[in-house]
Swiss-Prot record:
Active-site residues per Swiss-Prot or TrEMBL entry: R175, S224, E294
Pfam family, one: FAD_binding_4
Organism listed in the record: Moorella thermoacetica (strain ATCC 39073 / JCM 9320)
Gene giving rise to this polypeptide: murB
Gene Ontology annotations for the cellular component aspect, listed alphabetically: cytosol
PANTHER family: UDP-N-ACETYLENOLPYRUVOYLGLUCOSAMINE REDUCTASE
Protein name (record): UDP-N-acetylenolpyruvoylglucosamine reductase
Gene Ontology annotations of biological process type: cell division; cell wall organization; peptidoglycan biosynthetic process; regulation of cell shape
SUPFAM superfamilies reported for this sequence: FAD-binding/transporter-associated domain-like, Uridine diphospho-N-Acetylenolpyruvylglucosamine reductase, MurB, C-terminal domain
Cofactor(s) annotated in UniProt: FAD
Keyword annotations of the record: Cell cycle, Cell division, Cell shape, Cell wall biogenesis/degradation, Cytoplasm, FAD, Flavoprotein, NADP, Oxidoreductase, Peptidoglycan synthesis
Cell compartments where the protein resides: Cytoplasm
Amino acid sequence: MDLTALAGELQTGLKLQVLTNEPLSRHTTWRLGGPADLLARPRSREELDYCLSFARRKGLPLHILGNGSNLLVLDGGVRGLVVQTREWRQVIIEGRKILATAGTLLPGLLQVASKKGLGGLEFAAGIPATVGGAVVMNAGTPAGCLGDLVVGVEVLDYDGRRHILENREITFTYRHSSLHRAGTVVTVTLELVPDEVPAIRERIEANLHRRRSRQPLEWPNAGSVFKNPPGYYAGRLIEAVGAKGWRVGGAEVAEKHANFIINRGQATAADVMELIDRVREAVARQLGIDLELEIEVWGEGL
């Protein structure tokens, strides 16, 4: 595959930024992972549509990248085209409803909403995700999930057709949604709750403080590695088997929160995967509970 020629063709007629053999360690919160064959960074609806149609025409594998959180890219990298959405950020407010492009960062959306006196999204304070990625995985905390607020989601299906899906047409479950199979999220519309600005900001600060005090945010990480099994907290299970502080290469089970694996410097995806396997095996053997990954895994090993 001539990546330079493909990149040039993808850029034709647009001021689209396209990178070849781009290390995805630069674009993920874990700061690790191999290269993308092609990385495109659309800044408008037109550019996003063009990227998706280009991948279809060329038969390229397609991955949609938001802020790179909740994601492990293997060391061999990702074949085909990776489209990074976070360069196209737009927010429109109409009454209690707020429409955001998929690449809008949740912290930015929360800031805009709070200034307008719109509450209900405070549980998402500190989640380092784009709106598109967050709605696909139904991101949230024990205080709430994004799917609870969704009015509608605009998607482009795999044939390039546009659909507006209402909440009732989408299945939201714990850290998952049917949007995984729907295509590419373009915009998300949420319905929030009017409230006093100081009260909203107080809740945001309380949630940020709680997150900072309980999570190892001083180290590169991808958020929670495992889903909580029904009736349990994954972090407590991992702690119960004595896995806090376990280390493989530069990857370590965080002392502050055992459901986080941190990159202490020069960690590889292979280090992380080996640590994940060790933790899962220990929890299954000692407690009889299978831990399911919350993170996504892309690409191929070396």
